């Protein structure tokens, strides 16, 4: 299962992952697998352009963050390529993942 979370931003994610982790510790034996790790394996996050992309990369890994411009909507960036300045501190490989490769691999058909 692969899920892309778009049009939601990512500011809520730290709280969600913390709550999932707390639930695991409060209900030992209820989960066959760690729900935090399952979330990280199966969900790709598209932050709003004003969200902290570096925090999101720390939470999910660069391989599960996807770029989306929301252009031409008013809440989107007027020039989507300006987002490159928002990810300038990522290394080249991670920047390429976020800006292109993750979405590409997420939307490519998978073998049956």
PLM regions: where:
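Mid-to-C-terminal alpha-helical segments outside catalytic/metal-binding sites
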Residues: 12, 44, 50-55, 59-64, ...
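Single, functionally critical "micro-switch" positions that shape active/binding sites
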Residues: 69
